[in-house]
Design a protein with these regions (language model features):
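Terminal targeting signals and extreme-terminal segments of soluble enzymes
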Residues: 1-160
Length: 160
């Protein structure tokens, strides 16, 4: 497990501890720092900043290290933020002993993102959550509320 200068921890959560938490408790732990974020969050510099049942927000500030060869921010940053926010929104609906994984997701990039864009937030909201499948939608916005990208996901729900 590693720790950032901001006090956030990164790593993998022990299976027994994870099974003992509801989905909402799990995501709340990511937000408040009592549970570690994944290593992708460390690599890309994003954080999970808000949670309510069926609703999650992840945020990042794009920087030069996120650029593609053309100079704009690589679409993978938007994809990762949306995948995280939407998937965790589904996770927040689950009972203890259950987890989810992304089966598929689709995003549409609407505006270029650059290092000058500033803070961006991906908001994921559950559309439907059944026993085996959950769906969610998401949007990525800048600080002025402009939609930079949007997407949908389908998640497989399984006993963990």
């Amino acid at each position: 497990m590693t720790e950032s200068s901001g006090g956030k921890r990164f790593g993998v959560i022990d299976d027994d501890r994870r099974r003992a938490l509801s989905g909402l408790e799990f995501v709340q732990g990511l937000v408040d720092g009592t549970l570690p974020l994944n290593s992708m969050a460390e690599t890309l510099g994003y954080d999970v900043v808000e949670v309510a049942k069926g609703h999650v927000v992840a945020a990042a500030t794009p920087h030069a290290g996120h650029r593609n060869p053309a100079g704009t921010v690589h679409g993978g940053l938007a994809a990762t933020l949306l995948d995280s926010a939407m998937g965790l929104a589904v996770q927040s609906m689950l009972d203890k002993g259950f987890a989810q994984t992304t089966l598929e997701f689709k995003i549409s990039l609407l505006r270029p993102i650059t290092p000058q864009t500033g803070l961006v937030k991906a908001e994921g909201k559950v559309i439907s959550c059944g026993r085996r499948v959950g769906t969610a939608e998401g949007k990525l916005t800048d600080e002025d509320g402009r939609v930079l990208a949007h997407g949908t996901t389908t998640c497989l729900i399984y006993e963990h």
